[in-house]
UniProtKB/Swiss-Prot annotation:
Annotated pathway: Amino-acid biosynthesis; L-histidine biosynthesis; L-histidine from 5-phospho-alpha-D-ribose 1-diphosphate: step 4/9
Name used for this protein in its record: 1-(5-phosphoribosyl)-5-[(5-phosphoribosylamino)methylideneamino] imidazole-4-carboxamide isomerase
The enzyme's E.C. designation: 5.3.1.16
Primary enzyme class: isomerase
Reactions the enzyme catalyzes: 1-(5-phospho-beta-D-ribosyl)-5-[(5-phospho-beta-D-ribosylamino)methylideneamino]imidazole-4-carboxamide = 5-[(5-phospho-1-deoxy-D-ribulos-1-ylimino)methylamino]-1-(5-phospho-beta-D-ribosyl)imidazole-4-carboxamide
Source species: Neisseria meningitidis serogroup C / serotype 2a (strain ATCC 700532 / DSM 15464 / FAM18)
Lineage: Bacteria, Pseudomonadati, Pseudomonadota, Betaproteobacteria, Neisseriales
Taxonomic superkingdom: Bacteria
Length: 245
């Protein structure tokens, strides 16, 4: 089970939100590149970046910080990024910078054909991010909850060549209330695409539960507030996950 530290970028700083609310941001670092190096040194084998400003604006907003992170760690570990990716040009620019994968979220829900086009243009490099509240997909930086169930949406992408789906339970994100294992497993069982869990990871019991769900198609987990606030020691958690594989 791969654990992936999250670095959420807001105005060039590393922050964490509660339930996706920009006004509920806690600043953890003024140097995202140093944060990226820290997680690499703790044993991270991949990093997850989110351009929070970009998610709301619909265009990249934190390029200097993203470039600094890539300069610091991209030669050693793959880095993926989501937030504000709405067209093929942006994807190409990000991949040219050194990102390994890009995450299409809002645009995947609004225009599933865009995912197909992106997978064709950049095979193996496209991740779909599905964010849900009570099972229904949310878009535009979680500001709008749609009438689409995430499982129905996920099935649309099965034949497109998506490399994985990141499933975020908005109600759990940043709340330290535990991963929504049931919803994550239901999604993973419903599709042939590997699912990465996100939102609510709190302690080692969550790691154990996620590892037990690997057989259902849960391939990894993104962790944020828990590793920043210390309820999870990242190195210890990854070692535990490796031992349970």
């Amino acid at each position: 089970m791969l654990l992936i530290p999250a670095i959420d970028l807001k105005e060039g700083r590393c922050v964490r939100l509660r339930q996706g609310l920009m006004e509920e941001a806690t600043v953890f670092s003024d140097s995202p590149a140093e944060t990226a190096l820290h997680w690499f040194e703790q044993g991270a084998r991949r990093l997850h970046l989110v351009d929070l400003n970009g998610a709301f604006a619909g265009v990249p907003q934190n390029l200097p910080a993203i470039k600094d992170i890539l300069a610091a760690v991209a030669k050693d570990i793959p880095v993926q990024l989501g937030g504000g990716i709405r067209d093929l040009k942006t994807i190409g620019q990000y991949l040219d910078l050194g990102l390994n994968d890009v995450i299409i979220g809002t645009a995947a829900v609004k225009n599933p054909d865009f995912v197909r086009e992106a997978c064709k243009a950049f095979p193996g490099r496209i991740i779909v991010g599905l964010d849900a509240k009570d099972g229904m997909a949310a878009i535009d930086g979680w500001a709008t909850v749609t009438g689409h169930h995430v499982i129905d949406l996920a099935k649309r992408f099965e034949d497109d060549g998506v490399n994985s789906i990141i499933y975020t339970d908005i109600g759990r994100d940043g709340m330290m209330s535990g991963v929504n294992i049931d919803a994550t497993v239901k999604l993973a069982q419903a599709v042939r695409i590997p699912v990465i869990a996100s939102g609510g990871l709190t302690g080692l019991d969550d790691i154990r539960a996620l590892c037990a769900a690997e057989k259902h198609g849960v391939a990894g987990a993104i962790t944020g507030r828990a590793i920043y606030e210390g309820s999870i020691d990242f190195a210890q958690a990854q070692q535990l996950a490796d031992s349970l594989d």
